A protein has these predicted regions:
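Metal-dependent catalytic neighborhoods of phosphoester/phosphodiester hydrolases
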Residues: 1, 16-21
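Active-site-proximal segments of metal-dependent phosphoesterases and phosphodiesterases across multiple
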Residues: 1-9, 101-102
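Long, structured stretches of catalytic cores involved in phosphate-ester chemistry, encompassing
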Residues: 4, 15, 164
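Active-site neighborhood of phospho(di)ester-bond hydrolases with catalytic His/Asp-centered motifs
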Residues: 5-13, 25-28
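Short solvent-exposed loop/turn micro-motifs enriched in small/polar/acidic residues
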Residues: 9-10, 21, 33, 177
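Glycine-rich nucleotide phosphate-binding loop and flanking beta-alpha elements
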Residues: 14-15, 32
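Beta-strand-connecting loop/turn residues
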Residues: 21-22, 45
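Catalytic centers of hydrolytic enzymes
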Residues: 29-282
């Protein structure tokens, strides 16, 4: 057999019972609605898996009495977690909404928090990493966790000017990402990979892209992204080419600290970093 004997998959919330190139693959839907069971038959003489059986069993809870010991344990931990989750960390003067089509104050704040935490020149945030908005009033740990639930680690990357241009092209894919430390103008009606018309550093105004081309190919930039993006996720393939350093920081924790450090109640406006030159195509 090859180096892989079994793939246990997730994330898509699908039921998978499959075999590809002799490798069994299982996924048991989501949220405890099913159990995946795979039986592998091991040949001791040859030191390899020689057979397998895949099952996905639907779970049932109707009419089943909870186990008293387990229920007590769940109740205790629920109470302890809720005490922390509902603890207020900040107060918003107005709602902060996510926006998948344009720059948003929430996206700016998240990107600013990450850039401030790492000290890099630029921060890039994938749009899919911002799951919901924040209402006006008290903001709790649970509220921030709902915005960034994946607990992604932050990575510091060194990008060439052309790699940064390509990363900005990934920002303006079908669903817009958010940025800090860089400003740009883009045309969503242009072909993918050719949408960023102009880009420059936010603090100094130093040009990065002009008329769709890199201005100074010899420049390099320090860029913060989460580990999912740094591995090429969400179309950010170019980031996987770059040298990266783990920062030891987690996105949601960084946002919590940033929010609590701001003058209260928090007022956050869009920074005007992203200019869309035409409507998104239908």
């Amino acid at each position: 057999t090859g180096p892989v004997d079994l793939i246990v998959s997730g994330h898509t919330h699908s039921e998978v019972r499959a075999e590809v190139n002799g490798i069994p693959i299982v996924q048991a839907r989501s949220s405890g609605t099913a159990l995946g069971v795979v039986t592998l038959t091991w040949d001791r003489g040859h030191g390899e898996v020689v057979d397998h059986a895949i099952h996905v069993w639907t779970t049932r809870h109707e009419g089943v009495s909870p186990d008293a010991e387990v229920a007590a344990l769940v109740g205790r931990w629920t109470d302890e977690v809720e005490a922390v989750a509902e603890r207020p960390i900040a107060r918003l003067a107005r709602p902060l909404r996510r926006d998948r089509d344009d720059e948003s104050a929430l996206g700016d704040m998240i990107a600013d928090a990450q850039r401030e935490a790492t000290g890099d020149q630029i921060a890039l945030v994938n749009g899919g990493g911002i799951r919901t908005g924040l209402d006006a009033g008290p903001v709790s740990y649970a509220d921030v966790f709902a915005v960034q639930p994946f607990q992604n680690a932050l990575v510091s990357l060194d990008l060439t000017a052309d790699q940064l241009r390509r990363a900005l092209e990934a920002v303006v894919q079908d669903r817009l990402g958010q940025v800090s430390g860089v400003c740009f103008r883009f045309d969503p009606t242009r072909p993918a990979g050719e949408r960023v018309i102009e880009a420059w550093l936010e603090e100094t105004g130093e040009p990065i892209v002009g008329e769709g081309e890199v201005v100074n190919a010899g420049l390099t930039f320090s860029v913060t992204a989460n580990n999912f993006m740094a591995a090429g996720g969400s179309g950010y393939d170019v980031l996987a080419e770059a040298d990266g350093t783990a920062t030891g920081l987690v996105d949601s924790e960084v946002l919590m600290r940033h929010l609590s450090s701001l003058p209260q109640p928090v007022e956050y406006e869009e920074r005007g970093r992203i200019e869309r030159l035409a409507p998104w195509p239908e």
